[in-house]
Amino acid sequence: MAVITMIEAQKRSGRYNVYLDGAYAFPVSESVLVDFRLAKGMEVDKALTAQLIDADNVAKAYNRALDYLSQQLRTEKEVRDKLADLEIPAETIAATLQRLRSLALVDDAHYAASYVRTMMHTGDKGPRVIRQNLRHKGVLEQPIDEALTLYTTEEQLTVGTAVAAKLAKRYQRQPFGTQQQKIRQGLLTRGFDNDLATKMLATLDLTPDEDEQWALLVKQGEKLWHRYRTLSMRERQYKTKQALYRKGFNLDDISRWLADLGESAQ
């Protein structure tokens, strides 16, 4: 059985070299040194040596994890993936995560709640997208469900209505029907449900600017009328009317414009 003859501090803080029977044997971290009460004169067999090396590997992985966690909150999956990228063995990662959990340094339920609160106050996403993001980060359904209870209907309406107002401004030069469709689609894409999107649109109480809508219709209509110039008059009118309606213009306005066009052509 070998005997520890010297424990020497490395230049790196918190790291030590252990010598057995006068020869360098292996390095350990300060936490391993303390946990195993290593001291000069202590006997060390092969089993203990292997145990010390394993413990040191966990200690090094733990420190890598702490560095990663110091930047921001992380999920277990994010920490696991980071350590795996560093080519740390799976069993060492498992032991490291167990230690992190015991110290509440990784806690997916806490992460999910924090993420939801942050998205409520600084983001523009609804519950569905938030759920997808948390799933992608490896959080299980139960903690996601619990965290999303923080995002009440009232909070969703507040966030979503602000998003809808920005979208309304972005699409204000579109046909009114198209503007409405794009606002709704933007809300759905961001994870709000359809019923709430309807309420958000109602809260905005948008009304079309008749003069602006008419000018847009005339501009688009003239382009389409020219595009279908080779068709018969009946088919030309039908195609133009259909295309303008698909673009979101009011059907009565389209009919009026076509009637005016017909009169001017006579």
Swiss-Prot record:
Gene3D superfamilies: Winged helix-like DNA-binding domain superfamily/Winged helix DNA-binding domain
Species per Swiss-Prot/TrEMBL record: Levilactobacillus brevis (strain ATCC 367 / BCRC 12310 / CIP 105137 / JCM 1170 / LMG 11437 / NCIMB 947 / NCTC 947)
A GO CC annotation given for this chain: cytoplasm
UniProt protein name: Regulatory protein RecX
Pfam family, any one: RecX_HTH3
Record lineage: Bacteria, Bacillati, Bacillota, Bacilli, Lactobacillales
Keywords (A to Z) from UniProt: Cytoplasm
Record-stated family: Belongs to the RecX family.
UniProt keyword Oxidoreductase present: no
Subcellular location(s) per record: Cytoplasm
Principal subcellular localisation of the protein: cytoplasm
Keyword Flavoprotein listed: no
Function: Modulates RecA activity.
One GO term (biological process): regulation of DNA repair
